Swiss-Prot record:
Optimum temperature is 75 degrees Celsius. It comes from the Archaea. Optimum pH is 9.7. The keyword Oxidoreductase applies. The gene is vorB. One of its GO terms (biological process) is sulfur compound biosynthetic process. This is Ketoisovalerate oxidoreductase subunit VorB. GO terms for molecular function: 3-methyl-2-oxobutanoate dehydrogenase (ferredoxin) activity. Keywords: Oxidoreductase. It catalyses: 3-methyl-2-oxobutanoate + 2 oxidized [2Fe-2S]-[ferredoxin] + CoA = 2-methylpropanoyl-CoA + 2 reduced [2Fe-2S]-[ferredoxin] + CO2 + H(+).
Length: 352
C-alpha cells in the first residue's frame, strides 16, 4: 500500500478519484482552492470531467445536472461560497440526487478571514437551505480521513440518494501528513432505475423537486423524514477515547478533537478521569451514546471553534443538562491550556 506525504485538500481529490468520481465542478476560494486545482490537474488526464464554473451558484447547479445524469459528482468551497450554494443543495435534497460537497471551513461571518473555524456547523448539519431536508455530514480529523471519508461519502450519497457534506476546516485542508492510498479504485456506473442518462432505457425517468399538489408534497416530506430516520438508525459513527471510567467527557470533532485528545492524556496523567467522544458523523449525531454517558453521571465539555453550535446538540442528547464550553473564534485555534483550565475547574483543582 503506497504512502505519501500530502495535504488534506489533495487527499480529498485522491479519495474522490478512487471512489469513481467522474465530474468535478467548482469555483476557487481560500482555503479550499487546492481541491479545485488538483481536480483540474488530474481529472482530465484520466478522462473525467472538470469545469471551473463562473460562480459558486453555477458550480452547484452543474453538480445538480451531472448528478441527475447518474454521475458521481462533487464540488468544494468554504464559508461565503457555501452560503451561495445553499439553494442548490436544497434542490439536490429535494430531487433526491447524490452528491458530495466539501466545506473547508474558514472564519466568519461575512468575509471574515482565511483562518480555521467550525462555525458552519448549524448551516450544514441542520440543513442551511429552504425546506425540510438534512445533509449527511462527515467530520474528518486527519489527512487520512480527508481521503477515507470522501470515499465513504460517495457510497452514502448513492445509498440514500442525498447530498453528503465533508465538514473540514482550514487546518485540515492545509496541513500535510502521510496518506495511505486506498487499495483499489471503484468503477462507478449510473443507476438507470432513476437517472436521466439520455438513453431509451431512462427516457421515462423524472428528476424534479416540484410537487404542485399540496398533499403530494406533504407525503414526499414525510417520506424524506423516514429516510433521515433510517440514516440516524444505521449510519452513526463516533470514536471514543478513555471514556470507560470518565467523569468528564470532552466532545469534539475535526481538528479540535486532536487538541482535546492531548488534553485527555495530560489530565489523566494528573489523575483526573477524563475521556473524549469524537463524532465522525455530525448528522446523524451520536445522541444515543451521549444519552448513555449522561445517565452515568458524566459532565460534558463541548470543545469547538464556534460560539457553541454543537453544544446545543449535546444538551439535547444529554436531556438538557448543562454542557460546559471551551471555544475560540475568529480563526484562532483552541489551545491545550484552554481545555485543561476548564477540566481542572470542573474537577475542583487549581489551574496552576
Amino acid at each position: 500500500m503506497a504512502t505519501q506525504m500530502v495535504k488534506g485538500n489533495t487527499a480529498v481529490i485522491i479519495g474522490a478519484m478512487y471512489a469513481g468520481c467522474d465530474c468535478y465542478f467548482g469555483y476557487p476560494i481560500t482555503p479550499a482552492s487546492e481541491i479545485l486545482h488538483e481536480a483540474s490537474r488530474y481529472f482530465p488526464l484520466v478522462g473525467r470531467k472538470f469545469v471551473q464554473a463562473e460562480s459558486e451558484e453555477a458550480a452547484i447547479n452543474m453538480v445538480y445536472g451531472a448528478a441527475a445524469a447518474g454521475h458521481r459528482v462533487m464540488t468544494a468551497s468554504s464559508g461565503p461560497g457555501m452560503s451561495l450554494k445553499q439553494e442548490g443543495i436544497s434542490f439536490l435534497a429535494g430531487a433526491e440526487l447524490p452528491a458530495v460537497i466539501v466545506d473547508v471551513m474558514r472564519a466568519g461571518p461575512g468575509l471574515g478571514n482565511i483562518g480555521p473555524e467550525q462555525a458552519d456547523y448549524n448551516q450544514l448539519v441542520k440543513g442551511g437551505g429552504h425546506g425540510n431536508y438534512r445533509n449527511i455530514v462527515l467530520a474528518p480529523n486527519s489527512v487520512q480521513e480527508m481521503c477515507d471519508l470522501t470515499m465513504d461519502a460517495f457510497e452514502l450519497a448513492d445509498k440514500y440518494r442525498n447530498p453528503v457534506i465533508i465538514l473540514a476546516d482550514a487546518v485540515l485542508g492545509q496541513m500535510a501528513e502521510p496518506l495511505r492510498f486506498p487499495e483499489r479504485a471503484v468503477e462507478h456506473r449510473p443507476d438507470t432505475s432513476w437517472a436521466v442518462c439520455g438513453s431509451r432505457e431512462t427516457m421515462k425517468n423524472l428528476v424534479t423537486s416540484i410537487f404542485l399538489d399540496f398533499d403530494e408534497l406533504e407525503e414526499f416530506n414525510f417520506y424524506l423524514q423516514e429516510k433521515y430516520a433510517a440514516v440516524e438508525e444505521n449510519e452513526v459513527r463516533y470514536e471514543e477515547y478513555m471514556v470507560e471510567d470518565a467523569e468528564i467527557v470532552l466532545v469534539a470533532y475535526g481538528i479540535s478533537s486532536r487538541v482535546a485528545k492531548s488534553a485527555v492524556d495530560t489530565a489523566r496523567a494528573d489523575g483526573i478521569k477524563v475521556g473524549l467522544l469524537r463524532p465522525i458523523t455530525l448528522f446523524p449525531f451520536p445522541s444515543e451514546r451521549i444519552r448513555e454517558l449522561a445517565e452515568g453521571g458524566c459532565t460534558f465539555i463541548s470543545v469547538e471553534m464556534s460560539s457553541g453550535q454543537m453544544r446545543e446538540d449535546i444538551k439535547m442528547a444529554s436531556g438538557c443538562r448543562d454542557v460546559e464550553l471551551v471555544n475560540r473564534m475568529g480563526g484562532n485555534l483552541i489551545e491545550l491550556r484552554d481545555i485543561l483550565r476548564k477540566i481542572r475547574e470542573i474537577a475542583g483543582e487549581s489551574n496552576d
